């Protein structure tokens, strides 16, 4: 219960359950296999604050039995953590938002049957279960909206592990009730020190990290796995970036993602800052290489994504993920079409540098050992590590997440464009840099400011941040990073080349040792 009590008072980050006030009713939506003990603890902790929590399981909303969900999950769980091609799903679903994903996947099947079969293996189950699976997401969405209509006193909704702007759309006319993600499906985040990390300290860490961006004329990012990119910034780009960079727990540390949207308010989350207005999307000409062995969905053999003046020019390595990435570079329209609100053609522009800000998150070992159905893009996989402070997750795309018409909503022009050409109107092809160094040069001074060094947020050592943290206890303990990725040849003894050829096996072994209690890092 102490951890649950801390969780329901946390006001910062992805899961700000503490934004609910006494007398409120909130809705928490969890997957069918969420830990019921954890959910009961959260509901009881809320009740102590005089907040009524409606905890709804997705399958109950959709009218599907637990047994059917277990059978579907077993049939569809055909992938391991090392099957990096799972990340290709994001091009078509969720973040990529292709209007007709089946037609897009068929384009791959016709050109590369082996890649198609490796990425979308056929599940073996009855026609009845297949029908349930195919209609499950829509059934949950419809039932969720009805539940909110039938329970008008609910003022706040928490659900999903990420993609907050897209998750809120699932609520339809109730979208403004969406207040955050929900990562307490099991005990991992709840048993960490994330819930008790002081919310005002968390926000100060974030504002310290972004305060120099408006004055930057160049950014440079490197990483020991091989990333090295740079981009020059005009004053106009820097100003727009600074206006749109903020989102609790997920900073938009590349100007392209910070624009093409109505920015979040720094003080009234999750409200949008209407005073800043719609920020027209920008394309920034970054040049260099992004190298990785991890993505949102899985791990992959070391991959290099080469950039020239903002565009992807070449993909090297990466196993099946790299093979699929190279194939998709020729997807119809992605080189020659010009997306709505953009001034240059093409889809394959660097878009995202999502940056985590809490030093108490850690990589969940269970993700490395649990098979997850490929359609469940935001359940498990390899998502938890992107929440570790200092980790950057990159993605590409020509995305205007919102339109200028209505705050927080995509433009009908973007939606119609996507339907007309069956191209993604979002972002895709995530890559994680686990130990990046991120610097910006201050305009007119020649001085560089380091925002992240070898995966450590510089703001965690800032005197003002430490002074504020001292109000809650020992600042060394409060601000200490609890998890550093153990990468052979970089942070622990071993050969990186061997790791880079098959990182999935390394991470499975790492997780297995933790599960058995034999890990040298758990003494």
Language-model segments: residues:
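A hydrophobic, small-residue-rich beta->alpha segment in the mid-to-C-terminal subdomain
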Residues: 321, 388-392, 397-474
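Active-site bordering "gate/hinge" segments
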Residues: 1-285, 289, 294-295, 308, ...
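Dual-mode signal for accessory low-complexity, basic/Gly-rich regions
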Residues: 298-299, 314-405, 438-440, 474-486, ...
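Short solvent-exposed loop/turn micro-motifs enriched in small/polar/acidic residues
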Residues: 214, 283, 296-299, 387, ...
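Hard-cation-handling environments
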Residues: 303-305
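Short helix/loop capping segments that flank catalytic or ligand/cofactor-binding pockets
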Residues: 166-170, 229-232, 239-242, 300-301, ...
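Short C-terminal domain-edge/linker segments immediately following a structured domain
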Residues: 57-61, 189-192, 321-323, 336-337, ...
